[in-house]
Amino acid sequence: EWLYRCPKPTFWRALTDNDRGSRFHIKSGSWLSADMFIDCKEVQVIMDGKEQKPYAPDNNSYGCDVYADEIVVKYTYETITTPATTVLVSYTVDVSGKIRVDVHYKGVQGLPEFPVFGMRFIMPTLADKYLYKGLSGETYPDRKAGAKEGIYEINDLSLTQYIVPQECGMRMDTEWLEVTRHTTLDNSRTDSLSQILRIEKNDKNFAFSCLPYTASEI
């Protein structure tokens, strides 16, 4: 209900004027293809410490009488860069319904500079607003000094009004984020109550952007 596509590692962001001027997109363009065509090599499902078979027909045997204290789903991705490298993504679900996401990039020498590294979550419907605890305004690694820590609510999810659309909306050093929406693709719902998705840091603060377009669309 919250996801339009399966979450995947992302290596590409929208270009900026500085990128175009320095020809960054030419030097690091291989990450665009890696972002678009990343290959999932392996899926592991672990239930209470025991590995399960993740594919049909074996995974059709789970009924309402099957219980577990913890489920871990691990994905191993391989990039189509030269040389290739791998990214490990694991989702750990506990009995409370909380999902912990861990992402590990296995770096190798010889690859160009990263445009960005993270996870992309695409929602099926537009968000109304978001609330977060972190730095004020748009912040980037070189623009954090002028920001203030606090809790901020953003109701305008449109792009920053640059003459040429480009990367925007980044929020650095975030402790938690709450995305609110009231529209879904669930036709069985007759109410229009707001729904909230909360994302919290594990041990380190994170950066995020919440935009109505993907990087390739921008």
Residue ranges and their predicted role:
Residues E1-I218:
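Beta-strand/loop-rich accessory regions of lumenal/periplasmic or secreted enzymes
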